[in-house]
A protein has these predicted regions:
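Donor-binding and catalytic core of enzymes assembling or modifying cell-surface/extracellular glycoconjugates
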Residues: 12, 166-252
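Short amphipathic alpha-helix
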Residues: 18-25
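A short, glycine/small-residue-rich beta-strand->loop->alpha-helix junction that serves as a flexible
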Residues: 7-17, 145-147
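Secretory-pathway luminal glycosyltransferase catalytic domains
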Residues: 38-167
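Short hydrophobic segments within beta-strands
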Residues: 7, 136-137, 173, 245
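Leloir-type glycosyltransferase catalytic cores
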Residues: 248-265
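Extreme N-terminal starter segment of soluble prokaryotic enzymes
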Residues: 1-5
Length: 265
């Protein structure tokens, strides 16, 4: 069985896609896959969400730790473009695999298993959730610099589409607290009820993820974090309504991430 080292890199959304790709490579192509984190703490973060990992793992070590051997020098790293289909054959020289693996052919075969692993935490979080919750997620940070952040007009349009939103509380999530505060002020001024998740549980990306996964409707950002939370929500409740942007990212190939059941706003 050929060995293949798959690199872990990025936030939890990217890590879940990489984990799904590793399952595909091992279960369908019979590679012996090892997961290697490119920065410290990524394996621990992934395990927090999915529990025990079925692969051997390699913790982060600085590049100066490694001595290049003649054997490793003949092996190569293959970069998989984010939205490219899964390949069925790799050169014998390919030993290291990098990428975000966001084409359905990479994750579809293992999606049910990954969602099942995530669902344990969703069920626990559901005990603290109000009924008929609407979750709104805004991705900022590096998206602002890259020009990928979604305009307020998208969120306003999604809010205007659904007349049932005012029947329950709204929770706003983002990696930018200032944006959360400003958005909540806008919603309050419009007469909508704000649910402050921090009142019931310590705020963190982990708790935000599973709160979104328990919402009745979600106005999504174009992030993989929100993508996975919505997939988890709809896997356990087919009545969950999700609103998404009409184009995921400027790269048109990214639209493969848009589910046919989501409502474009």
């Amino acid at each position: 069985m050929r060995r293949l080292d798959l690199n872990l890199d990025g936030g939890i959304g990217n890590l879940l896609f990489q984990y799904s790709a590793a399952l595909k490579l091992q279960n369908h192509f019979e590679f012996k896959v090892s997961l290697k984190e490119l920065s410290p703490g990524l394996i621990k973060r992934l395990e927090k969400y999915v529990g025990e990992i079925e692969f051997s793992t390699s913790r982060f070590r600085s590049s100066s730790h490694f001595a290049q051997t003649s054997n490793l020098g003949r092996l190569t790293t293959k970069w998989e473009p984010s939205f490219s289909p899964c390949e069925t054959h790799y050169s014998i020289r390919v030993r290291f695999l990098k990428g975000y693996f966001q084409h359905p052919s990479w994750y579809q075969d293992s999606l049910e298993l990954v969602l099942k692993k995530l669902d344990t935490h969703r069920e626990s979080a559901s005990l603290h959730m109000p009924r008929n919750l609407t979750a709104i997620h805004l991705r900022r940070s590096d998206y602002v610099r890259l020009g990928w952040d979604l305009p307020m007009s998208y969120y306003d349009k999604a809010l205007a589409i659904d007349s049932n939103i005012n029947q329950g509380p709204i929770a706003v999530f983002s990696d930018d607290q200032m944006i959360v505060d400003l958005f909540e002020q806008r919603l309050s001024a419009a007469g909508l009820t704000i649910h402050n998740n921090a009142d019931s549980v310590a705020s963190s990306a982990f708790n935000d993820f599973f709160t979104i996964a328990n919402a009745q409707r979600v106005i999504m950002s174009n992030s993989t974090f929100c993508w996975w939370a919505v997939k988890l929500a709809q896997s356990s409740n087919s009545e969950v309504v999700a609103y998404c942007p009409s184009t995921w990212l400027p790269d048109q190939k990214s639209n493969v991430l848009i589910d046919s059941t989501w409502i474009k706003a």
